[in-house]
C-alpha cells in the first residue's frame, strides 16, 4: 500500500483503516494513520482514504 506523496490534510472525504489487507479499493488512496483523525492503534497497518479532487468527475 503506497502512500501518496500528494496527500494533504483537510481533503479527506471518507476513510477506513485496515489490519490485514493493504490494498485500497478504487477511488481510495493509501494514507498514513497520522494523516487521519484517528486514535493511534498498533493493530492497524494503515488507512485508505478518499480525497477531495481524486474522484473522477463526469465529463460534460
UniProtKB/Swiss-Prot annotation:
The tissues in which it is expressed are: Expressed by the venom gland.
Keyword hit for Signal: yes
Tell me a Gene Ontology molecular-function term this record carries. toxin activity
Can you supply one Gene Ontology CC term for this chain's record?
A: extracellular region
**What is the annotated localization of this protein?**
Secreted
The source's superkingdom equals Eukaryota
The UniProt keywords, alphabetically, are: Disulfide bond, Secreted, Signal, Toxin
Q: Does the keyword Signal apply?
A: yes
Where primarily located? secreted
> What's noted about post-translational modification?
Contains 3 disulfide bonds.
As for family, the record states: Belongs to the scutigerotoxin-02 family.
Protein's recorded name: U-scutigerotoxin(02)-Tl4a
Species of origin reads: Thereuopoda longicornis
From which lineage does this chain's organism come? Eukaryota, Metazoa, Ecdysozoa, Arthropoda, Myriapoda
